[in-house]
Amino acid sequence: MRPSCASSSSSSASPSLRLSSVTVAVDKATSELLRTPDWTIIIAICDSLNSNRWQCKDAIKAVKRRLQHKSSRVQLLTLTLLEAMLKNCGDFVHSHIAEKHLLEDMVKLVRKKGDFEVRNKLLILLDTWNEAFSGVACKHPHYNWAYQELKRCGVKFPQRSKEAPLMLEPPPPVTQSSSSSSMNLMSIGSFRRLDETMATEIESLSLSSLESMRNVMDLVNDMVQAVNPSDKSALKDELIVDLVEQCRSNQKKLIQMLTTTADEDVLARGLELNDSLQVVLARHDAIASGVSLPLLLQAPEPRETSSSLKTCGAAALESADSESSSSSSSSESETDEVEDVKDDFIQLAKRHALLNALHSDEEEETLLLGNDNEKTAEAEAKTQCKDLALFDTTTTTTTKSEQDIIELLSLTLSTTALPSPQTQPQTQHPSFFADDNILMNSYVVPWAQSQEEPQVPKMTQFAPSGPQFQPWPLQQQQPYSYGYPQPQWSGGQVNSNDTTFWSQGGNENMVFERNLQVSNSFPARATGTSGAATAATVDRQP
């Protein structure tokens, strides 16, 4: 009959915790890593038992198993959970506790004389339950039996505090019509008592557990500092894992305490402890994830006094202000230097612009004196220069200071001294001895070397595609003296006008004014077929 009722109740109500999750919830609520009770899980367990009574059996089994744990911390957390279940659940929980021999296990723990806190907690609970369930119409005599058994053994129960809430007595029988309203009132009363219990726990935490939290944090910090940052496996040690989990749970409880406390001293210490916990946990997480440790994740120094903290904070603020002022002054000095440099560039540019304006008239006059050929040559040269120095349109935009430097350099190059033009225009003619027409590279005697070409008039072409030649004026030719003595048989100067050469491709005679080499004077031989060859005659005296 019981399983059928359980199945019907489970089908009608939606359970907040499944059958398998009740045991897991009990294990979490009594974890060895917890320093104080986790009331969120405890409330969830009580709600699940009130909505699904068939889960009470599994919950009591899990509590009995956790009560046999070797750790005194686990035993204390288990007793706290058991007390909350008796206060916030109905008669079905009281019956299961009495039937599952849980009270006998509690008596055995008292007789063992183990941990003092655990033994004291057991005696207080048994004394409270005996007072709550005693009377003429006692439904659960097991609680009275446990109390009397310890009394016969000579155990002295501690004096209970008058402010401690008494055990919730079983509700009187009510009719079915008013069952829903009475259940609501009972749940409201139970939650009020639960809130009072949580408030007392949080208040005791705020006054007594800050130092223990700091000790655990310092221990974790020392272990994390001793670990090699490149070795992740060192953080998998069981002791380090337990301490880190304890720090995380302490941080959660600390945040809850800070939201409810009104003491300024406790609030200041709690905030400081919270910051230190965040730094230590962040350092641990950085090493565990293999991320490089930031400079800010340094070990928190131990707290000395509130006055030392205030002085350190004031010194930090002063150093931050000095750094900010120095950085602002350095930035202002840099901007002033940049502005001074820009002003110098602007002044230089204006100076060069004035110089260009002064010399612009002279340059225009000299440029207007050039002939058409010079203009054509200059145009070709400019086009060649433009072809060589192509403008890169993909050049990135420079800053304002770089543009000023470029403009200054361009002004400096534009103001360089130009070569003075000739007073008379000179016509460019291709020469017979031009570099483009020389076909061989031979030695040239000194008297045949190229001299400074004077202005020559335009001469006729002796071939359709050949270069043009014209005799040079005699009045502009200056004789060249080589310092050689005249021969004995030479009676006078060599007549340069009698020296004549016959051109190869034309019928015109081309006369060159030069000093002849006397020792190698031979008559020229005719090479053409169109006319008779004329020998070059030289006046010499024997």
Curated annotation (Swiss-Prot):
Phosphoserine: residues bearing it: S161, S521
Membrane topology: Peripheral membrane protein
Renumbered residue ranges of the record's region Disordered: 303-340, 522-542
Superkingdom field: Eukaryota
Domain GAT residue range list: 201-289
Keywords, in A-Z order: Membrane, Phosphoprotein, Protein transport, Transport
GO CC entries: cytoplasm; membrane
One GO MF term: ubiquitin binding
Positions of the VHS domain: 29-158
PANTHER family according to UniProt: TOM1-LIKE PROTEIN, TOM1-LIKE PROTEIN 7
Similarity remark: Belongs to the TOM1 family.
Role this protein plays: Might contribute to the loading of the ESCRT machinery.
Protein name (Swiss-Prot/TrEMBL): TOM1-like protein 7
Annotated organism of origin: Arabidopsis thaliana
Lineage summary: Eukaryota, Viridiplantae, Streptophyta, Embryophyta, Tracheophyta
